[in-house]
């Protein structure tokens, strides 16, 4: 399909079916588009609000014909209030500091990335990435991208978050952490740090990607409350006691205009 702007047509393609990495026994398809070029920032902002995610210079969204388990989710940061478990996580990691750094790959980051992949996702494609693949993931971006490095008082790197800046918030692209520090819940700590960082920047939302209720890897995103999900093209407060059924969530929707 083609959307036409005054500058150039924006082309969207669907991928071939592939086994879903999140829900066993299902196949996934995505709609993808290249966001490189002079309109990258504007296009990325519009697509992010419509539920798309970025990888390198590509924006994508799920368009699986028989499944709508992937639900875009974001946190209105001004309203976020940590629950009891999250407050314990904040106290447990009080000595860990997050530092904003440019989106440049380092061997120190890559060593931590490999340890995380081998421990958590050994069967996944990312476990086979070499340093050059990792550098491309970090640095191959047409938009305003940054990183947060989380370090102990001894300057040990224990967690890294890759983040895109949007005009209405931050988008958490990918995070990884020391797999030997499970008791610290560093992934949750990183999200709460990003919520606070988004608030300090005066931006309203932290975009967390896709929430999948029945996936152990993705269900945790609904713990950061209040949250909003994209439902039939509109961002709606997430009520965990009255969740929409899969068939009611609707497919990915395109912005009415990609150039506004």
Swiss-Prot record:
Listed InterPro entries: Acyl_CoA_acyltransferase, Asp_Glu_LeuTrfase, N-end_Aminoacyl_Trfase, N-end_Aminoacyl_Trfase_C, N-end_Aminoacyl_Trfase_N
Catalytic reaction annotation: N-terminal L-glutamyl-[protein] + L-leucyl-tRNA(Leu) = N-terminal L-leucyl-L-glutamyl-[protein] + tRNA(Leu) + H(+); N-terminal L-aspartyl-[protein] + L-leucyl-tRNA(Leu) = N-terminal L-leucyl-L-aspartyl-[protein] + tRNA(Leu) + H(+)
EC number: 2.3.2.29
Statement: the UniProt record of this protein carries the keyword Ligase: no
SUPFAM superfamilies xrefs: Acyl-CoA N-acyltransferases (Nat)
GO BP: ubiquitin-dependent protein catabolic process via the N-end rule pathway
Localisation per UniProt entry: Cytoplasm
Function in brief: Functions in the N-end rule pathway of protein degradation where it conjugates Leu from its aminoacyl-tRNA to the N-termini of proteins containing an N-terminal aspartate or glutamate.
The name this protein goes by in its record: Aspartate/glutamate leucyltransferase
Gene: bpt
């Amino acid at each position: 399909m083609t959307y036409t702007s005054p500058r150039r047509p924006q082309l969207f393609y669907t991928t071939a079916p592939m086994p879903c990495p999140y829900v066993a026994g299902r196949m996934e398809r995505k709609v993808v588009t290249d966001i490189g070029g002079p309109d990258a920032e504007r296009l990325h902002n519009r697509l992010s609000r419509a539920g798309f995610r970025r990888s390198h210079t590509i924006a994508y969204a799920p368009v699986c014909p028989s499944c709508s388990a992937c639900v875009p989710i974001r946190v209105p940061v001004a309203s976020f209030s940590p629950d009891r478990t999250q407050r314990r996580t904040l106290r447990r990691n009080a000595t860990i500091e997050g530092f904003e750094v440019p989106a440049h790959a380092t061997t120190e980051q890559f060593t931590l990335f490999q340890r995380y992949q081998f421990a958590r996702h050994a069967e996944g494609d990312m476990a086979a990435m070499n340093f050059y693949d990792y550098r491309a993931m970090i640095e191959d971006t047409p938009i305003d991208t940054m990183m947060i490095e989380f370090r102990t008082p001894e300057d040990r790197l224990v967690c890294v978050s890759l983040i895109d800046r949007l005009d209405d918030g931050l988008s958490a692209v990918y995070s990884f952490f020391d797999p030997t520090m499970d008791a610290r819940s560093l992934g949750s700590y990183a999200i709460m740090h990003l919520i606070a960082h988004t608030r300090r920047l005066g931006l309203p939302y932290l975009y967390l990607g896709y929430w999948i209720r029945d996936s152990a890897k993705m269900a945790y995103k609904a713990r950061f409350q209040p949250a909003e999900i994209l439902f039939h093209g509109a961002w709606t407060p997430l009520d965990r006691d009255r969740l929409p059924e899969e068939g009611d969530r609707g497919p990915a929707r395109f912005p009415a205009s990609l150039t506004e």
